[in-house]
Amino acid sequence: MNKKTKMKPATLLVHAGRNKSYANGAVNIPPYRSSTVLFDTLEEYQEVKHYEATFQDAVSSSFRYGRLGSPNSFALEEAYSELTGAYRSVATNSGMSAINIAVSAFLEQGSHALVTQGAYEPAAELFTKHLGPFGVKTQFISPSIGREISDLIVPETKLVYLEAPSSNTFEIPDIDILVESIRDKSQELGTEIVITFDNTWAGPLYFRPLEHGIDIEILSATKYVVGHSDAMLGLVACTEKTYQSVKNSSKNQGISAEQIGRAHV
């Protein structure tokens, strides 16, 4: 257990993401408004690309191209990982783009997804109107389904999308029962099912989904993190098993959060 894991939430909020390498000693990280980054040698550039490709530790501080992240977004991702208990996180330009990169990373033609009823309407439409034409089958489930969710899981089920409270009805599912039932059924079928969870309402200070067996926590940071209705932001907290797929999904779709640097000005 490192020093930060022992901190109470209020103390952790002060210290999270304060990596000195991002700020060159400045108390607050200066805004990095850059697209192109210079390297002294080709070898240095190739080393950074290698770290990105293999997702080694140095990827978090590898500033190679603005769309792929900057010290501003790296610090935010690091802070959010500390708050959620995640392996690593990915920052995006909105809550909806965070949902998109998280779910599309694990779905393909023929995949089956279970989505909670009463979910955020644009999220529901992502499944039905965007992913549907690509051959993804979506089935909506009651937030109170409990153990009966196992009856709906088939070999093609690749992802479960949950919210608590539900955006439209404020229903709160029994997360522990759902996770246990999903894991038991997937083990029985010999398949892998990714469980995603939109935690925008509670946030990591009041509920930590990854501690309850969730694979991916999604947050519309436009709400509490930004807090002033003057910018948009999304965050995806990942387990070690899911991070690489989500990071690639973000990179390959051209989604970034580089307005973070501009927001400082």
Predicted segments with their positions:
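Conserved PLP-enzyme active-site core in the AAT-like
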Residues: 2-4, 13-15, 19, 88-262
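N-terminal amphipathic/basic leader segments beginning at the initiator methionine
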Residues: 2-49
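Residue-level signal for pocket-adjacent positions within structured domains
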Residues: 9, 28, 60-63, 219-220, ...
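Generic, ordered loop/turn and secondary-structure boundary motif
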Residues: 14-15, 23, 34, 38-40, ...
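Conserved N-terminal alpha-helix of the aminotransferase class I/II PLP-enzyme fold
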Residues: 30, 36, 41-97, 123-129
